[in-house]
C-alpha cells in the first residue's frame, strides 16, 4: 500500500 492509501481518512 502507498502512503496516500493510509491518508484516505
From Swiss-Prot:
Keywords: Amidation, Neuropeptide, Secreted. Its main location: secreted. GO terms for biological process: neuropeptide signaling pathway. The modification Phenylalanine amide is found at residue 9. GO terms for cellular component: extracellular region. It is found in: Secreted. It comes from the Eukaryota. The keyword Transcription regulation does not apply. The keyword Cell division does not apply. Belongs to the FARP (FMRFamide related peptide) family. This is FMRFamide-4. It comes from Sarcophaga bullata. The lineage of its organism: Eukaryota, Metazoa, Ecdysozoa, Arthropoda, Hexapoda.
Amino acid at each position: 500500500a502507498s502512503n496516500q492509501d493510509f491518508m484516505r481518512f
